[in-house]
Amino acid sequence: MQHARKKFRVGRTSSHNRCMLANMLKSLIHNERIETTLPKAKELRRHADKMITLAKKNTLAARRLAVGRLMVRYNTLTSKEARQVKAGDLSAYNVDRRVIGKLFDVLATRFSSRNGGYTRILKLQNRVGDNAQKCIIEFLA
């Protein structure tokens, strides 16, 4: 029996869950709105609210914690990013660095007077293939 166990489980390994949530959180910070399934959005909301609260502290320790939780890679490029940089497109260079900047500069100042509840979940129609409940998770304006 799983009494009082609040672990996020969607049929994946723990490392896959951790990476998936970090990638979804980076996408949410970058785009401020993503479409996903309801269980993933509910778990993502917990992590997003914690990251905004961390960003509002605006200390070096908070930045280092955010880099670790978002699994930001500063010094490595994927092969696709390397090709884009080689071709002269510097906008593709380290998207993760811009995510940390946006989190601490834009979102933290936007929510500086708010004490929680930084995201909203809007339910959509179910997905056609597997009838999964879809939703949109977004930051409040």
From Swiss-Prot:
Pfam families: Ribosomal_L17. The keyword Magnesium does not apply. Keywords: Ribonucleoprotein, Ribosomal protein. InterPro entries: Ribosomal_bL17, Ribosomal_bL17_CS, Ribosomal_bL17_sf. One of its GO terms (cellular component) is cytosolic large ribosomal subunit. One of its GO terms (molecular function) is structural constituent of ribosome. The keyword Electron transport does not apply. HAMAP family: Ribosomal_bL17. Belongs to the bacterial ribosomal protein bL17 family. PANTHER family: LARGE RIBOSOMAL SUBUNIT PROTEIN BL17M, RIBOSOMAL PROTEIN L17. This is Large ribosomal subunit protein bL17. The gene is rplQ.
